Amino acid sequence: MKPQTFTWKKLAADELTRVYLDEMRRDFPPSELKPLSMILNSEAAGMAHTWGVFEGETLVSYLLMVRPMGCEVSQLDYFSVLPAYRSTGIGARLLAALPAHEEGAKAILIEAECPEKADDEAMAV
């Protein structure tokens, strides 16, 4: 089996909008999803950025990072692997690779929720 090669790219506003509409609304419950306008405004102000991870031209994953200018800590705000790529270990590989892409960050803050506390059983996987 050929090893997968991924390309990391910071998404432009139009790309992020598509990811939000097509992917994020599926991947996160409405109660946890910030409005698109808030995310776009944060990115435009330099307070956040979103990585798209691609295999060739195909989006595999996205990681929305929050880091105000001058801050040495990045926060992973949203992270998802697209359904066709889940349960393959890609998520763990991408999290391990994340520090190399967060230039200038001395730490990365990751919030995780306990699956047993999920309101929706489908979201607890």
PLM features: residue spans?
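A short helix-loop-beta-strand connector motif used in the catalytic cores of GNAT acetyltransferases and
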Residues: 41-52, 61
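Conserved beta-strand in the GNAT
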Residues: 52, 57-67, 73-80
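Conserved acetyl-CoA-binding loop-helix of GNAT-fold acetyltransferases
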Residues: 81, 87-101
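Conserved GNAT acetyl-CoA-binding A-motif
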Residues: 102-121
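Short amphipathic alpha-helix that is part of the acyltransferase structural core
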Residues: 1-38, 54
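A short, internal acetyl-CoA/4′-phosphopantetheine-binding micro-motif in the GNAT/acyltransferase core
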Residues: 79-86, 114-116
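Hydrophobic, well-ordered beta-alpha structural blocks that scaffold small-molecule cofactor pockets
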Residues: 64, 96-97, 108
